[in-house]
Amino acid sequence: ATDRHLWAETFDRDLSPETLFAVQSEIAAAISTALGRELVADSGQVAAPTTSNAAAYDLFLRARAQAGSRVDADIRRTIAVYRQAVAADPEFALAMGELGLELTNLYWFNTRAATDRDEARLWIDRALALQPEHPRLRYILARHLYHGRLDYEGALPELAVAEQGLPGS
């Protein structure tokens, strides 16, 4: 090992909403290389967000940070923020998918309302129509099939596809 500072590299770029994510990916890839790790299997690059809209991405990150609760009010707050992200960018496939996952969670853990389950599937299908091979979206579909439809056999092939593309699988 050397005493060279790993984080001394300068990233001098013009920042705009259009270039911000590319610079973030470049920095993360440099850190990954310095650590000798790959952040995404097969590509060696950080997975890019599926939006170039900074406001939508900020909302997405806020929702993602608060996701994971099984408490009805918490899930509903997360759903509301994902809805804002999708409203800010109606083509933001990953936000649509995560919205679908949270609606599935609302159904499974709390309401058992078919309207929540069915809306979840609509968002997941919209997301997959935009990015059919996105591994996180395939994982979300598997979770929906498993918890929302009790289609355990249908969930397995989706999990297999997701596993091939998700980091750490």
Give the label of every model feature segment:
Residues 1-169:
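Acidic, proline/glycine-rich low-complexity intrinsically disordered segments
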